[in-house]
């Protein structure tokens, strides 16, 4: 076998050179100035390697057409998510809108959800309409007005009830509280 | 034997090169340098247009100086210290091995 001696020879040579390298390196390290140089050189080389890696990555992406794919299609501004305070993601105000409708019959503001039942009663449709009942009672038994008022929901109380149809719950509450306060005050006065 | 040659050969021989390289890559990724350079490459590619005449070599010559300055000082200092300790560490190891 002619290859074995040469292989052995090269192996010997390798060990010799590696020992040489170590020795060279040791000599180099002993001098602080050349150590600095070596450190800086190492840093520069490895940094350049890293940069080259990024370049090749970018180049590969560009050649394969993935770079433009990564950029993607520009988004339409109308569908962009809005990040303003007090606005939802579509850029619409989050504040509650007044959902009141004006009743065409009595020109009163009525909450949208209650508009249909209000209109029904206001225009006097349906069986349970208090207005129709009151009208009937008023025409047929005009003398028994006292009975009507004692009946509660009929007649003159109708308009007062309609105030509750509007969406302003605050008004309701405030009126209730004022009533309570009034009663308390009255109580205080009496005691 | 030049400094660069010796250092190259020795670090490859002892396996320190890959160690230092891993450390460097990790630090640079952590501090966002990688993304910055990537962005730089992209903007330059966009500026140069769609023509295929722009080569990797051209890109390297253009961006490498900028990429070097982009490295944060803290990272640079840390890496230089690490490289120094690793190199000197080996020297003491060699001495320790030779002493007995």
Curated annotation (Swiss-Prot), chain A:
Residue span of region Disordered: 146-191
Subcellular location as annotated: Nucleus, Nucleoplasm; Cytoplasm
Molecular function GO labels: transcription coactivator activity; zinc ion binding
InterPro entries attached to this UniProt entry: SAGA_su_Sgf11 (IPR013246), SGF11 (IPR051078)
Compositionally biased intervals (Low complexity): 175-191
Keyword Transmembrane: no
GO cellular component assignments: cytoplasm; DUBm complex; nuclear pore; nucleoplasm; SAGA complex
Keyword field: Activator, Chromatin regulator, Cytoplasm, Metal-binding, mRNA transport, Nucleus, Phosphoprotein, Protein transport, Transcription, Transcription regulation, Translocation, Transport, Zinc, Zinc-finger
Residues in SGF11-type zinc fingers: 101-122
Domain of life: Eukaryota
Any Pfam family the entry gives: Sgf11
Modified sites of kind Phosphoserine: 167
A GO BP annotation: mRNA export from nucleus
Subunit structure: Component of some SAGA transcription coactivator-HAT complexes, at least composed of Ada2b, not/nonstop, Pcaf/Gcn5, Sgf11 and Spt3. Within the SAGA complex, Sgf11, e(y)2, and not/nonstop form an additional subcomplex of SAGA called the DUB module (deubiquitination module). Interacts directly with not/nonstop. Interacts with the AMEX complex component xmas-2. Interacts with Cbp80; important for promoter recruitment of Sgf11 that is not associated with the DUB module.
Task performed by this protein: Component of the transcription regulatory histone acetylation (HAT) complex SAGA, a multiprotein complex that activates transcription by remodeling chromatin and mediating histone acetylation and deubiquitination. Within the SAGA complex, participates in a subcomplex that specifically deubiquitinates histone H2B. The SAGA complex is recruited to specific gene promoters by activators, where it is required for transcription. Required for nuclear receptor-mediated transactivation. Binds independently on SAGA to promoters in an RNA-dependent manner.
Family: Belongs to the SGF11 family.
Domain notes: The long N-terminal helix forms part of the 'assembly lobe' of the SAGA deubiquitination module. The C-terminal SGF11-type zinc-finger domain together with the C-terminal catalytic domain of not/nonstop forms the 'catalytic lobe' of the SAGA deubiquitination module.
Name assigned to this protein: SAGA-associated factor 11 homolog
Curated annotation (Swiss-Prot), chain B:
Subcellular location: Nucleus, Nucleoplasm; Cytoplasm
GO biological process terms held by the UniProt record: heterochromatin boundary formation; mRNA export from nucleus; poly(A)+ mRNA export from nucleus; positive regulation of transcription by RNA polymerase II; protein transport; transcription elongation by RNA polymerase II
Keyword Transcription regulation: yes
Any one GO cellular component localisation term in the record: transcription export complex 2
A family per Pfam: EnY2
UniProt GO MF annotations: C2H2 zinc finger domain binding; chromatin insulator sequence binding; TFIID-class transcription factor complex binding; transcription coactivator activity
Family that this chain belongs to: Belongs to the ENY2 family.
Annotated PANTHER family: ENHANCER OF YELLOW 2 TRANSCRIPTION FACTOR
Assembly description: Component of the nuclear pore complex (NPC)-associated AMEX complex (anchoring and mRNA export complex), composed of at least e(y)2 and xmas-2. Component of the SAGA transcription coactivator-HAT complexes, at least composed of Ada2b, e(y)2, Pcaf/Gcn5, Taf10 and Nipped-A/Trrap. Within the SAGA complex, e(y)2, Sgf11, and not/nonstop form an additional subcomplex of SAGA called the DUB module (deubiquitination module). Component of the THO complex, composed of at least e(y)2, HPR1, THO2, THOC5, THOC6 and THOC7. Interacts with e(y)1. Interacts with su(Hw) (via zinc fingers).
Job description of the protein: Involved in mRNA export coupled transcription activation by association with both the AMEX and the SAGA complexes. The SAGA complex is a multiprotein complex that activates transcription by remodeling chromatin and mediating histone acetylation and deubiquitination. Within the SAGA complex, participates in a subcomplex that specifically deubiquitinates histone H2B. The SAGA complex is recruited to specific gene promoters by activators, where it is required for transcription. Required for nuclear receptor-mediated transactivation.
Name of the protein this chain belongs to: Enhancer of yellow 2 transcription factor
């Amino acid at each position: 076998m002619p290859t074995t001696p040469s292989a052995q020879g090269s192996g010997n040579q390798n060990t010799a050179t590696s020992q040489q390298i170590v020795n060279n390196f040791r000599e180099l390290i002993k001098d602080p100035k050349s150590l600095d140089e070596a450190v800086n050189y190492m840093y520069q080389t490895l940094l350049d390697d890293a940069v080259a890696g990024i370049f090749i990555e970018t180049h590969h992406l560009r050649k394969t057409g993935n770079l433009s794919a990564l950029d993607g299609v520009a988004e339409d501004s109308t569908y962009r998510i809005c990040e303003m305070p007090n606005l939802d993601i579509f850029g619409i105000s989050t504040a509650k809108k007044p959902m009141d409708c004006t009743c065409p019959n009595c020109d009163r503001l009525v909450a949208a959800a209650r508009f249909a039942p209000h209109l029904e009663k206001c225009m006097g449709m349906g069986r349970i309409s208090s207005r129709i009942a009151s009208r009937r009672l008023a025409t047929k038994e005009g003398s028994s007005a006292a009975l009507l008022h004692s009946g509660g929901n009929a007649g003159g109380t109708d308009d007062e009830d309609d105030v509750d149809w509007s969406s302003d719950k605050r008004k309701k509450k405030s009126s209730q509280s004022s009533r309570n306060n009034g009663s308390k005050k009255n109580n205080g006065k009496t005691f | 034997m030049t400094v660069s040659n010796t250092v190259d050969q020795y670090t490859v021989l002892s396996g320190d090169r890959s160690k230092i390289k891993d450390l460097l890559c990790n630090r640079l990724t952590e501090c966002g340098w990688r993304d910055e350079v990537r962005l730089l490459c992209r903007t330059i590619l966009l500026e140069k247009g769609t023509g295929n005449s722009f080569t990797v070599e051209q890109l390297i010559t253009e961006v490498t100086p900028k990429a070097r300055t982009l490295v944060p000082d803290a990272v640079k200092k840390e890496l230089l210290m690490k490289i120094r300790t690793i190199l000197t560490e080996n020297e003491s190891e060699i001495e320790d091995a030779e002493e007995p």
